[in-house]
Regions:
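Short, polar/acidic, helix-capping and beta-turn segments at strand->helix junctions
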Residues: 1-93
Length: 93
């Protein structure tokens, strides 16, 4: 499933953008009777690689004991005001 429609860019920096992105992912999973425990892999793309630590602090709040595989890289041109893109793959039964 690909979600590409941007309704509003969250202001306030990397932390609120990561938080809202992860909430959006949770909501999509919920619509398919799945949870963050069903996520097997995430790719996190940052506009600025220096945001890795802050992104990671916010990201890990959404996973309790389950830690899916993750790839993170920075220096990407994501668009005006977009600081992070997170793509997750989930095993939905």
């Amino acid at each position: 499933m690909k979600i590409s429609l941007i309704i509003k860019i969250v202001e306030g920096g990397i932390r609120p953008q990561v938080n809202q992105t992860m909430i959006n992912i949770q909501n999509i999973l919920k619509k398919h009777n799945a949870t963050m425990d069903d996520v097997v892999k995430c790719t996190c793309i940052l506009a600025n690689g220096d945001d890795w630590g802050t992104m990671s602090e916010e990201y890990v709040k959404f996973f309790k004991s389950h830690k899916p595989a993750r790839t993170t890289f920075g220096g990407a041109e994501l668009g005006d005001g977009i600081l992070v893109e997170i793509e997750c793959i989930a095993n939905i039964k």
